[in-house]
């Protein structure tokens, strides 16, 4: 694999020499940093099993190497890498996999280790969505996830990825993560804090990542991280699990932040060792039981992961002074909800008791029941999935609901050919050789729902959202 030139400040190299265990070679570290990062994907098991995915892609010339800490994760090498971006493959467009760096699969693996099965989870710094979607898959779309993102521009990307992956148990918020300890005390069974950091571990992906690096900036970032982990710890239920992670390598932003929390709450913080998380985890294990992943150990990004348990309650923070404002939605009455459910089932949309119908004007939404306890305590950017808009003739079903709720085995499902599916993703109407009978048609490809179409004569009217329409080459040559 080709080398690329990484910029290393001298002070950074000195810091790494001091931080690196004697069992590791500094020369190996430098060599690993100069190699481009291996690409990796995670199969979205909400849509397809790993076995079925491997069978589906077997003829594509993809070499998939299992990632030890994630059963759904694979390093990928492709024959058609230059001809077709991985994000333009049919399997990516329909949400069958997520392009995710291997190291970033570690925090969620730690969150669910040892049979941990949380019902209400917070992802404090969630965009672009790799870990939120991984959490949702581990929860099998049940329970509830609060996915927060401080950057306004990244909230839209977060929602797009959640929607593409067919996730329905998520509420989105847009706050500084330091507010949650006061706003939502002891509300979560598990919390992932993948903290903003100096990014020292990402030089294989971005050779200039350290251009603005300095020891002083590390100290400033670590101060923010301490405030974030303190807030997250307050939002965690007693007995709950907190995973703290970064994509950086210095100890000040990693081990020292976790030690600070334990020193602050000595009777409430327990470090849960990660040496048994996967075969070979001991190669990255610190004396506290954290994983400090230098890039040469597993040939991936540099990363840090710690798992903590809150063993008892801690004194509450002062209640926030802000007002949330009126919640603009109201629950749909049972009788009307039954009619809506029946109409939705007619086009192949079904949901379980984990979701409840709410209404705002002519909009119908499905909210995860597990998030209802947070209503009135925090303002949401987006909650659950938009099911439909009502109009005189019935319902206008929404694309995100089709992706999240539709069964490809519905009687009105219509499987497109590769050529027809390509037209669909380009936003064009489809003219199948044998038109379906139903007026409302659930459009599928590779036995996966990709949209809802109106049949007009022999034409299927395209309803694919304009912002998702693709140009250029689509699909593998074998699709």
From Swiss-Prot:
Pfam families: Methyltr_RsmB-F, Methyltr_RsmF_N, Methyltranf_PUA, YebU_pre-PUA_dom. GO terms for molecular function: RNA binding; rRNA (cytosine-C5-)-methyltransferase activity. GO terms for cellular component: cytoplasm. Keywords: Cytoplasm, Methyltransferase, RNA-binding, rRNA processing, S-adenosyl-L-methionine, Transferase. It is found in: Cytoplasm. It catalyses: cytidine(1407) in 16S rRNA + S-adenosyl-L-methionine = 5-methylcytidine(1407) in 16S rRNA + S-adenosyl-L-homocysteine + H(+). Specifically methylates the cytosine at position 1407 (m5C1407) of 16S rRNA. NCBIfam families: nop2p, PRK11933.1. This is Ribosomal RNA small subunit methyltransferase F.
